Amino acid sequence: MLKITSLSIGLLLNDILSGDTALNKMGVRVFPPKVPEGERMPWIAYRRSDLQQVAVKARNDVYDSVVIEIVVHAQKYAQCIAISEAVRNVMEDGPYRYNDVTGRSIEMGQTLFEGCDEDADLDAYIQTLRFSAKVTSK
């Protein structure tokens, strides 16, 4: 049986973000990289922007270092910041595990906040948060 790897991190991110109480109370919808046209705000979209395999020589082990971007869109600046704070809190609250239907799993531990950019367009305030995470297959 094939194991699942950090290529499946989006499945775990969906579970984490969609299941967060604070984000749900704010009415935030969660999407993978593609958001449906005309989706009403607030929403967040997540994506894996980089993945590097890391060998741990001392333990003869391997893990993946994954860079994750989460983009927050909201109509009001204060709402965008509040959602971004909730995202940061939930992302730094791990470790998290995703189990597929066959019992295979990945674990996302040690998640670090790497930075954030903000922007605006005609109808939205935007925050792009970046995290790096250590992901292992189980």
Identify the meaning behind each predicted range:
Residues 1-60, 82, 94-104:
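Small/polar-rich, solvent-exposed N-terminal microdomains that initiate assembly or binding
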Residues 1-5, 75, 119:
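A general boundary/transition motif marking the beginning of the first structured unit of a protein
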Residues 42, 66, 109:
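Short beta-strand or tight-loop elements
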Residues 53-55, 75, 137-138:
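Short, cysteine-centered beta-strand-loop-beta hairpins and adjacent loop/turn segments enriched
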Residues 57-62, 120-122:
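Short, solvent-exposed beta-strand/turn "edge" segments of beta-rich domains on protein surfaces
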Residues 61-78, 87, 125-135:
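Oligomerization/assembly interface segments of phage tail-like spikes and tubes
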Residues 83-89:
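Short amphipathic alpha-helices in soluble, non-transmembrane regions
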Residues 89-138:
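Acidic-leaning, charged glycine-interspersed low-complexity segments
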